[in-house]
């Protein structure tokens, strides 16, 4: 596990809140994502995944949401402040033999804060991204409560992983403007996964992809990687055309392999 003490404390605080609210329904909580793979970057979230054995009642959704709004930091994160938390809760029955796309019982992320502060409740969502999260989490997740990840997290068939990437592509590419760094790095990681079947960090995927790209597109992707690592300013004002060309190149590479 490569998270520092502050992030571990934040993950443990969130886990304690989840346990106190969901109580006997909670089977496990796992830490996954950057904290357990390549290390947390300046804007990385603390990614948590929980498994429950029964649907979450609205009253418990409200309590869990209130706790997460309090514990999670806001985006974009300032240096030294709490990190954003992303929590996905899955019903054990929904993932025992996963259908496509996988259904999440509850999702919290800072991109949804405005809606949640307007009193919207997290609701169950079926989304290709859920399938990809489970596939990657099974490979790397660390238990904060409950048994080893392979006890509950299913092995996602390769054809479902490929279908999830295919179905997630249009929305991902459409969100490029304003989220250039994340979209380009996610496309690079999709290319890597579609080519090899494995999951690696965004910065490692960018390095892998850039070595196989034309110089201009590679330079744009490297800029995204360096911004992700905190080495350069995350500024795309004068790189709109370059980011679009790079996204188009990466998208085509992914589609060729799916």
Describe the function of each predicted region.
Residues 1-29, 59-65, 258:
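Helical scaffold of the NTase/Pol beta-like nucleotidyltransferase catalytic core
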Residues 2, 52-58, 175, 193-194:
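A generic structural motif
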Residues 18-23, 37-42, 77:
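Short secondary-structure boundary/capping segments within folded domains
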Residues 29-70, 74, 84-91:
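Catalytic metal-binding acidic patch
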Residues 66-177, 184:
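Conserved NTP/Mg2+-binding pocket subregion across the NTase superfamily
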Residues 166-223:
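Extended, basic/helix-rich recognition subdomains
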Residues 198-258:
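Structured mid-to-C-terminal alpha-helical surface segments
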């Amino acid at each position: 596990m490569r998270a520092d003490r502050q992030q571990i404390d934040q993950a443990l605080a969130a886990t304690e809140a989840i346990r106190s609210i969901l109580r006997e329904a909670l089977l496990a909580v796992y830490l996954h994502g950057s904290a357990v793979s390549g290390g947390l970057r300046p804007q990385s979230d603390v990614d948590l995944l929980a498994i429950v054995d029964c649907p979450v009642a609205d009253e418990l959704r409200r309590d869990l949401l209130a706790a997460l709004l309090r514990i999670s930091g806001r985006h974009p994160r300032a240096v030294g402040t709490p990190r954003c938390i992303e929590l996905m809760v899955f019903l054990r029955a929904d993932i025992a033999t996963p259908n496509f796309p996988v259904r999440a019982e509850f999702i919290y992320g800072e991109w949804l804060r405005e809606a949640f502060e307007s009193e919207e409740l997290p609701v169950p969502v079926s989304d290709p991204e859920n399938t990809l999260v489970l596939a990657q989490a099974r490979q790397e997740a660390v238990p904060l409560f409950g048994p080893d990840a392979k006890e509950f997290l299913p092995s996602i068939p390769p054809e479902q992983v490929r279908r999830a990437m295919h179905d997630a592509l249009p929305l991902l590419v459409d969100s490029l403007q304003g989220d250039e760094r994340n979209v380009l790095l996610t496309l690079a990681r999709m290319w890597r996964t579609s080519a090899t079947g494995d999951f690696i960090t965004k910065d490692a995927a960018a390095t892998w992809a850039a070595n196989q790209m034309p110089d201009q597109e590679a330079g744009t992707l490297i800029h995204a990687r360096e911004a992700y690592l905190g080495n350069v300013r995350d500024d795309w004002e004068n790189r709109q055309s370059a980011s679009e060309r790079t996204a188009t190149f990466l998208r085509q590479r992914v589609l060729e392999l799916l």
